[in-house]
Amino acid sequence: MAVLGVDVGGTFTDAVVLDGGRVTTAKVLTSARQEESVIAAARAAGAENVERFAHGTTVATNALLERKGARTAFVTTVGFEHLLHLRRQTRAHLYRPCAAWPEPLVPLERSHGVRGRIGPAGELEPLDLDTLPQIDAEAVAVCLLHAYRDATHERAVAEELRLRLPHAHVVASHEVAPEFREYERASTTAADAYLGPVVSGYLHALSAAAASAGLPAPLVMRSSGGVATPAEAAEHPATILVSGPAAGVVGAARLAALAGNENAIAFDMGGTSTDVCLIADSHAERASERTIAGVPIRLPTVDLHTVGAGGGSIVWRDAGGALRVGPQSAGADPGPACYGRGGTQPTVTDANLLLGRLPDTLAGGVELDRAAAERALAGIDPAAVVDVVNAEMLRALRVVSVQRGHDPAAFALVAYGGAGPLHACELADELGITTVIVPEAAGVLSALGLVVSDERRDAVRSYLVPLAEAGELPPAGEADLRYEGQSFELTVPLQDDLAEAFHRAHAEQYGFAEREREIELVAVRTADIRPGPDLDLPRTEQTTVAGPSLLALPGATCWLAPGWVGARDGRMLRLTKQ
């Protein structure tokens, strides 16, 4: 029986079918109705007798970016109605005191307070549901003070709202993010409610379309790097905000392990941005929070670091005349000047073409216009453009490696996406990396990651007690720990001597440990994991090529720089520094 993975991107929808060691791929244009693109891609890949169907989508991300979610109300403890608007008083850019904040997902006129208060020792003020006003909304987020510790009041408010508004998507904070830090919990709950009707409608339409096409119900990739049922994804859609990129990291980790590299750095360079993620012992590094479209999301996610540099990034000069690349992008339409679709602004792709790093015709029959690229880059050195964009990506790669205490030379670089293999060798040279792995399916690796993804269900429990008083903990998972009086935590795998593990982690991160100081257990994170299919890729007779050379891949081109040798076996290109 076959296994199908379909990943929807902004421009293309990719499909991979794995059937008894035979791999079939397809790439179709993404339409406004994503479910139509999914079925079209599955058919193009020849999906038949499919036993398992996994899916990555941008529906939730697009709705949040474009602010096209449901009409949402916010209910909190009386006196805290401004919580989503006050935010944290930190600034993303320290020297921009007047920088504008994104608008909250819920306007102040739809933010309501209800009387009742939970304190450290229990109930301080009884809940008064009569103070809950009449609400007219498609979705409601409920976040009462200290509900992560005692959800009695919050549960009662949510039940009352579900009775009053039977067709609304009602989310309570203890159901989605039962952790302390009021603003992040409220922000996550608001996003979960805001996205609910949009994602639920899409997944219902996709499930119906899949059934009509003879496909099983789709499993949906979550930001955590595992798939869940459509019902689970629709219930808490904030969990699928990094769906596609997470699938790419899963694919990179599995492919690196197949090549014998348990430690790797995933490097996904697309048209508008680049995502990087550290993989240690064949597992992607994880984070418990991520900001998306200006909204903090306190949910498990693969620890991606993103920069606005991609193949379609526009080249420009700042007020001082310095060359800059991105974050603006030419997109797919009109695209880079060399696409011949009316684009006139210079891009990274135009520079790569003029440097001889791209063929005259791309996959899909797109003929590149060298003269148009020369006109767009008039007066600009193409090599300087590549140097600038490489510098942007090097910073991202160092963030996930050097800045976290890892020597990148001890890792392989897994390069994928449409533009990743073009820049991989030069980036590896700068970081001292001697092995680069380029998937044969570099342009559709996220879809391949979906094919082999695990089913994963994450849970978190807040403690906020001295570690010595925590009692028995689960045998497996992670613990958020800190010294008493600290504001932030370190996450350490659960083990017998958890205190000693935390001291070591603190010393590695900050250069010192205070073994006489009391340790506080903040939260414990666990995951229920059901392993996905094995990655069984067909091999061909190995061929070897030395750089400089261009190697064509489905949906991508690999630039083999001087001093590098590539071995190709039908599954991947393994590039080695000589």
Question: What residue ranges belong to the model's regions?
Answer:
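N-terminal glycine/serine-rich phosphate-binding loop of ATP-dependent small-molecule kinases
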Residues: 1-73, 125-141, 154-173, 197-204, ...
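General beta-strand structural signal in soluble alpha/beta enzymes
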Residues: 4-6, 51-56, 74-76, 169-174, ...
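Short glycine-rich, Thr/Ser-proximal phosphate-binding strand/loop in the N-terminal lobe
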Residues: 6-36, 104-121, 367-368, 454-464
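C-terminal, non-catalytic interaction/recognition modules in large multi-subunit enzymes and RNPs
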Residues: 8, 134-138, 205, 261, ...
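ATP-dependent carbohydrate kinase catalytic cores
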Residues: 35, 45, 173-181, 185-188, ...
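Active-site phosphate-binding/coordination module
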Residues: 70-118, 173-177, 449
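Terminal amphipathic helices with adjacent charged low-complexity linkers/tails
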Residues: 143-189, 193, 521-536, 569, ...
